[in-house]
Structure formats: C-alpha cells, structure tokens
C-alpha cells in the first residue's frame, strides 16, 4: 500500500526504489517537497516534509582504495564517523565517493540517492539510532521525494547491518 503526500506526486513517475518496494509488497508512504536550484540540506528537507529531524536519514556512498563501494545510512543531523564506518566493513580507510561518479555507480544523483534500488547491491550499514524509531524518511530515488518506511522493512530490503556510525559530539 502506498500513501502519497504532496502536490507534486501526480506528475511524478515511480522511481526504481518505489518499484522495488511495490514488487516486494512493502508498505511505505511517499512525500514530496519542492526542489530548489541550490543543494538542500537534510534539516531543510525535514522541515519541508514535516518530519522530526531524527527521523530523516541520508544515504552516503563511500569507497575503499580499490574503488569498492559501501552504503551508509545515517540521520541527516549527524556526521558519519569515518573510522567507525571503515571498521564495521573491515576496511582500513574509506573516502566519500566522488560526486561525479555517483550516478554512474548507483543510478542516483546527489540529494536523490536512495539506499533501495541502486544499480548494484552494496554492503549497507544503517545507523543504530534507527532502532529507536518505528519509521524513517529516506530518499525516494530522486530529488524532491522522500519514502517513509518502517525501519525493519528498510533493514530487510537493503540487507543492512545496524551499527553505531555517527560521531559522538562532546
């Protein structure tokens, strides 16, 4: 079942992430927001879709020195701890993937990168804070779209491990 929020949905085609969720018969909601020319940060997106900041998650794609890719899903108001990220995937060091390669590798663009439905299956890790929530907002697979999904469904669909990934702010 899909529940759609937002006035722009009627003009929008389903993304790969939505088609995969539909095929798997996973319940989710879709919400949209107006996209601007500038990069919109997660805090702004949370406000635009009426979500609590801790419910909105961003998808980061990192790579090792051999250009093997890993996906990390963390709250938009948090910073990925690169050492923790490398440790949980048994790598010495990881770097953010160059933005100019994101679409080629994942099929998605910056600001529209969903952990569901990438071109290839990558090892995915979701921040442990998601376990404290029933549902989370993730990118719907294009800028201006957010999927609201049960945490356990997200974990199952991405075959993710759940680990503490965020920097601890003191």
Q: Which positions does each model-derived feature cover?
A:
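Extended, low-hydrophobicity, polar/charged segments
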Residues: 2-168
């Amino acid at each position: 079942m899909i529940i759609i929020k937002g006035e722009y949905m009627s003009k929008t085609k389903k993304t790969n992430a939505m088609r995969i969720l539909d095929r798997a018969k996973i319940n989710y909601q879709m919400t949209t927001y107006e996209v601007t020319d500038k990069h919109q940060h997660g805090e702004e997106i949370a406000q635009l879709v009426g979500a609590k900041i801790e419910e909105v998650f961003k998808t980061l794609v990192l790579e090792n020195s051999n250009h093997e890719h890993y996906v990390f899903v963390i709250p938009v108001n948090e910073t990925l701890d690169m050492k923790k990220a490398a440790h949980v995937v048994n790598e010495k060091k990881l770097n953010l993937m160059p933005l100019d390669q994101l679409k080629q590798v994942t099929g998605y663009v910056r600001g529209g990168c969903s952990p569901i439905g990438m071109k290839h299956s990558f090892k995915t890790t979701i921040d442990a804070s998601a376990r404290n929530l029933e549902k989370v907002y993730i990118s719907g697979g294009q800028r201006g779209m957010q999927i609201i999904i049960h945490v356990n469904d997200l974990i199952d669909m991405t075959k993710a491990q759940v680990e503490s990934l965020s920097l601890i702010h003191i």
